[in-house]
C-alpha cells in the first residue's frame, strides 16, 4: 500500500477493512481534489515544485473529476486512493502533491469544505421552511384556534400566532447555523501533521483559493479539534427537536379525535391490511429522525471526549456522525416544508373547538379585576368555581360563585351581562391581547411584516456566503487552467 512505504509490512484484508474510511470518504472526495489543486498552486507559486510537474498533476486531477471517483483503486482512504491515481498517471512526480502536507491537515480541510457546502444547502432549506410557515400564517391571520398547555385547551389564539411561534424557533435555528458557519469556514491547511512545516508555504494563499474566511491559526488545534463539527451537530439536533414539535402536532391534529388538519396524499400512506387508513408517515419519520440527529451528536461527543493532543485516529469515527446528522436534518426540512405547505385545515372545527374547555376563563378573571377592582387571585378563585359548572355561565352564576368565594356580588360592583358576554367571546379575547408578541390581529400583522423582512435579509446574507465560496472556487479552477495550459 502506498502510505505504508518501507516502514511497515503487509496488512490483512480484515484489518484494511477495519481501518478504511473509503465509503464515508465519498462525502469529501470532491473537496479533497479541490484541496489538492489549491495546495499544488501554492507549492508552485512558492517555488516548491516545478511548473511541469504541477501542471501534469493538475491535469490528472481534472481527469479524475471528469471520470468520477468510481475509477479509484483500493486504499486506506480517499486521500491515498487519489494520490495513487495521480502517481499511476504522472509517475513518481505525482508524489510531489503531498509536499508540506499531512493527511491530518488535509482531511480536516476537506471536512470543513464539505460541511460548509452542506450548511449552505441546509440554511437555504431552512429559510424555505420558515417562509412556508410565514406564508400560511399570512393567509390565516384571523383564523381562531384553541391554544394548549399540557395538551389541554387553555386560551383561544389564532393559527397565524401559532405558526409564527414555530417560525420564530426555526429563525433561532438559522441564526445558530449562521454563527457556526463562521467557525466552520476556517482553513486548517498548512498545519501538516500538527507542528506546521519547514517548507516556505503560504497558508493564506490556500485559504483564499478555497473560499475560507480565515485560518485555524494554531497548527496543533487545526488538526486535532472537531468542535466545529460538534457545534454543527448540536445546532442540527436543536433544529430537529423544533421540527419534531411541528411533526407531532401534524400527527395529533390529523387524528379523528382532533380532526383539525388533513395531510396531503403525497405525504401520507395507507395500511397493508386496513384500506381506510391514511397515515401521516412523513411526519412520523421526521419525529424519528430527530432521534437520529441527537444520536449523532451524542456519538460525536463521546468520540471527542478525553482525546489527548493532537490528532487521533478516533476522529475517523466522528465523520459518519456528521453526515448522518446533517443528512437527517436536510431531508426532514425538505419533506416537512412540503407537508406543511399542503395541509388542509378544518377552520370551522378549529374555531368551534377554541371555546371548548372554558378557554376564555382567563379573560373573564382579568375583566373582573379591571371592572370591579378585586384582587386577581380572588377573581381566579371565582372563575375556578364557575369552571365546575356545565355550559356557558350566566351573570347569576357568577354572583353565586363570588358569594361563595368572597361574599361579593359582582353585578353590584359594576360588572354587567354585557361585560360577561365580551369576556367569553374568543375574538374579543384575542383582540385585547395586542401587546408585543400577542395574538391580536394588528400585532400578528406587525410580526408577519417583521418576519418577511428578516427572511429577505437572511436570503441576502446566504447569497453573499454562497457567492464568496463560488467566486473563490471559480478563481481556483481558473488558476488550474492557466497553469495547465501554460506548459
From Swiss-Prot:
Gene3D superfamilies: Fumarase/aspartase (C-terminal domain), Fumarase/aspartase (Central domain), Fumarase/aspartase (N-terminal domain). Signal peptide: none annotated. Coiled coil: none annotated. It is found in: Cytoplasm. CDD domains: Argininosuccinate_lyase. It is an enzyme of class 4 (lyase). One of its GO terms (molecular function) is argininosuccinate lyase activity. Keywords: Amino-acid biosynthesis, Arginine biosynthesis, Cytoplasm, Lyase. GO terms for cellular component: cytosol. One of its GO terms (biological process) is L-arginine biosynthetic process. It catalyses: 2-(N(omega)-L-arginino)succinate = fumarate + L-arginine. Its EC number is 4.3.2.1. Pathway: Amino-acid biosynthesis; L-arginine biosynthesis; L-arginine from L-ornithine and carbamoyl phosphate: step 3/3. It holds the Pfam family ASL_C2. Belongs to the lyase 1 family. Argininosuccinate lyase subfamily. PANTHER family: ARGININOSUCCINATE LYASE. This is Argininosuccinate lyase. It comes from Methanothrix thermoacetophila (strain DSM 6194 / JCM 14653 / NBRC 101360 / PT) (Methanosaeta thermophila). The gene is argH.
Amino acid at each position: 500500500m502506498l502510505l505504508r512505504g518501507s516502514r511497515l509490512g503487509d496488512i490483512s484484508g480484515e484489518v484494511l477493512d477495519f481501518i478504511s474510511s473509503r465509503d464515508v470518504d465519498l462525502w469529501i472526495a470532491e473537496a479533497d481534489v479541490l484541496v489538492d489543486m489549491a495546495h499544488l498552486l501554492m507549492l508552485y507559486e512558492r517555488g516548491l515544485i516545478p511548473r511541469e510537474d504541477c501542471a501534469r498533476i493538475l491535469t490528472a486531477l481534472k481527469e479524475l473529476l471528469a471520470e468520477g471517483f468510481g475509477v479509484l483503486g483500493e486504499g486506506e482512504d480517499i486521500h491515498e486512493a487519489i494520490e495513487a491515481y495521480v502517481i499511476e498517471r504522472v509517475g513518481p512526480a505525482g508524489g510531489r502533491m503531498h509536499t508540506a502536507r499531512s493527511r491530518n491537515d488535509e482531511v480536516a480541510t476537506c471536512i470543513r469544505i464539505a460541511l460548509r457546502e452542506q450548511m449552505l444547502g441546509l440554511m437555504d432549506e431552512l429559510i424555505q421552511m420558515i417562509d412556508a410557515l410565514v406564508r400560511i400564517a399570512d393567509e390565516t391571520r384571523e383564523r381562531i384556534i384553541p391554544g394548549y398547555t399540557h395538551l389541554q385547551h387553555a386560551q383561544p389564539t389564532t393559527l397565524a400566532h401559532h405558526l409564527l411561534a414555530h417560525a420564530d424557533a426555526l429563525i433561532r435555528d438559522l441564526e445558530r447555523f449562521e454563527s457556526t458557519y463562521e467557525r466552520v469556514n476556517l482553513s486548517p491547511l498548512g498545519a501538516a501533521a500538527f507542528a506546521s512545516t519547514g517548507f516556505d508555504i503560504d497558508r493564506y494563499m490556500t485559504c483564499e483559493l478555497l473560499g475560507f474566511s480565515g485560518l485555524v491559526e494554531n497548527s496543533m488545534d487545526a488538526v486535532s479539534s472537531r468542535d466545529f463539527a460538534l457545534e454543527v451537530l448540536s445546532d442540527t439536533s436543536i433544529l430537529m427537536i423544533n421540527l419534531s414539535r411541528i411533526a407531532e402536532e401534524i400527527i395529533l391534529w390529523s387524528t379523528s379525535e382532533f380532526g383539525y388538519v388533513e395531510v396531503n396524499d403525497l405525504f401520507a400512506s395507507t395500511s397493508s391490511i386496513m384500506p381506510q387508513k391514511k397515515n401521516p408517515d412523513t411526519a412520523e419519520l421526521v419525529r424519528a429522525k430527530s432521534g437520529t440527529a441527537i444520536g449523532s451528536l451524542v456519538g460525536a461527543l463521546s468520540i471527542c471526549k478525553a482525546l489527548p493532543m493532537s490528532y487521533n485516529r478516533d476522529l475517523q469515527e466522528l465523520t459518519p456522525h456528521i453526515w448522518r446528522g446533517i443528512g437527517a436534518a436536510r431531508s426532514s426540512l425538505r419533506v416537512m416544508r412540503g407537508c406543511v405547505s399542503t395541509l388542509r385545515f378544518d377552520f370551522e372545527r378549529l374555531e368551534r373547538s377554541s371555546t371548548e374547555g372554558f378557554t376564555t376563563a382567563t379573560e373573564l378573571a382579568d375583566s373582573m379585576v379591571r371592572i370591579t377592582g378585586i384582587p386577581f387571585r380572588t377573581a381566579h378563585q371565582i372563575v375556578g368555581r364557575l369552571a365546575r359548572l356545565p355550559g356557558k355561565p350566566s351573570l347569576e352564576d357568577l354572583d353565586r360563585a363570588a358569594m361563595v368565594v368572597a361574599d361579593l356580588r359582582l353585578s353590584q360592583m359594576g360588572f354587567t351581562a354585557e361585560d360577561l358576554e365580551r369576556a367569553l367571546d374568543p375574538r374579543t379575547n384575542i383582540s385585547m391581547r395586542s401587546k408585543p408578541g400577542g395574538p391580536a390581529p394588528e400585532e400578528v400583522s406587525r410580526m408577519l411584516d417583521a418576519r418577511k423582512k428578516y427572511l429577505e435579509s437572511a436570503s441576502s446574507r446566504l447569497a453573499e456566503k454562497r457567492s464568496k465560496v463560488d467566486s473563490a472556487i471559480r478563481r481556483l479552477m481558473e488558476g488550474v487552467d492557466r497553469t495547465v495550459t501554460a506548459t
